[in-house]
Amino acid sequence: MQELKDTQSEADTRNISIDRVGVKGLRFPIQIQDKLNRIQSTVATVSLAVDLPEEFKGTHMSRFVEALHQHGPLLDVHTALAIPRELLRRLSARRSHVEMEFPFFRSKNAPVTGIEGLMDYVVRFEMEAEANNKLADFKLTVIVPVTTLCPCSKAMSAYGAHNQRGLVTYSVRFASRPVWIEDLIDLVESCASCSLFSVLKRPDEKWVTEKAYENPVFVEDLVRNVALKTQSHSAFSWYRVEAENFESIHNHQAYAVIERDLRS
């Protein structure tokens, strides 16, 4: 076979290193083991990147996809962390970054009738590795839709209170053992006025309406509730919780964030 020119490995004279270069928007089938020991097949949108020293013109894009394919579809915290390490090896890089975002489904029964339905959540794995550090960084994020009901509206109004759907983006790093995706979702849902369901009959709708009315929370309450539960859990070394409410009486969102390092 004729030897082809390797343009990427040529020298670059501009003396500017690149923080991250790679591929993004790559869709890849994966399998996730859930808390009930079942394998869930889903499709992840993947980003893979490494640093590029100033002396090199380009990186080798095909090697990113090769590294992903080598590790197969079944992913957990341990197998996923092998991917950024493999990028370091294949591309002779000093730092690597991998991000995978995918829909995660779980069965959820309606609160009164017990009718089963599937709820979908967005889950994100973010991993970084460095050539001079044996410990790779892993961050798990769940994006959980919830219901919130306004405490101020309830206190002032003779009839009802405004309520809305919100999104909680909850990210954690683990201090020791990993925590199941489902447990993170449950933690967030327990802090809202009410959780969401995909199937509700009339008795269920009555129940969720009254449940939200009995548990009013501001967006500030929501992030503080999640923060308190996180800080009481020894499994976490860091967290970030962001809540966004799609206000039903405004054409804008309400928003709050808490981020803490729990190692000190």
From Swiss-Prot:
Top-level taxon: Bacteria
Single GO molecular function: GTP cyclohydrolase I activity
Pathway where it operates: Cofactor biosynthesis; 7,8-dihydroneopterin triphosphate biosynthesis; 7,8-dihydroneopterin triphosphate from GTP: step 1/1
S-S bridge residues: none
Reaction catalysis annotation: GTP + H2O = 7,8-dihydroneopterin 3'-triphosphate + formate + H(+)
Keyword set, alphabetical order: Hydrolase
GO biological process per UniProt: tetrahydrofolate biosynthetic process
Family label: Belongs to the GTP cyclohydrolase IV family.
Function: Converts GTP to 7,8-dihydroneopterin triphosphate.
Name of the molecule in the record: GTP cyclohydrolase FolE2
Organism: Akkermansia muciniphila (strain ATCC BAA-835 / DSM 22959 / JCM 33894 / BCRC 81048 / CCUG 64013 / CIP 107961 / Muc)
